[in-house]
A protein has these predicted regions:
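Juxtadomain coupling helices with adjacent low-complexity linkers
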Residues: 1-6, 34-40, 84-117
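Short glycine-/small-residue motifs
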Residues: 22, 83-84
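Short amphipathic alpha-helical interaction segments
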Residues: 63, 67, 96-99
């Protein structure tokens, strides 16, 4: 919710398989839906992804292309990928900036450290 309130962009948190939390988008459409193959690859790369080109559209879920990934920050705990913090965009929205990148990276780091406790 905090990222959504600060950026106005839909924000989702996933585990390895699907979406576990949604803010700024319909929970019915995105909650508990499996992540897309492309988002799964981003998680496996273990580095923060930021969309650079408006033509590049990576869907958040396998079931819907209504939201695409702006920033995706993998949640890492003890070297394992647990999920991802995703800041998304709808068609026509501009790519994310440095603020969104930093917020996603910070929240993913916090969640990863919290899971290690």
């Amino acid at each position: 919710d905090t990222i959504y309130k600060n950026t106005g962009r839909p924000t989702l948190v996933t585990d390895r398989d699907g979406v576990v939390a949604v803010a700024g988008a319909p929970k019915r459409e995105f909650g508990d839906k499996p992540v897309s193959d492309a988002l799964e690859r981003i998680m496996n790369e273990r580095s923060v992804y930021q969309q650079r080109d408006q033509g590049e559209n990576i869907p958040v879920t396998a079931a819907s292309a209504a939201l695409s990934v702006c920033v995706a920050a993998p949640i890492l705990a003890q070297g394992d990928v647990l999920g991802c913090v995703v800041i998304a965009r709808s068609a026509g929205d501009p790519p994310a900036g440095e603020t969104e990148y930093t917020l996603a990276r910070t929240v993913a780091g916090f969640l990863g450290r919290h899971m290690e406790l």
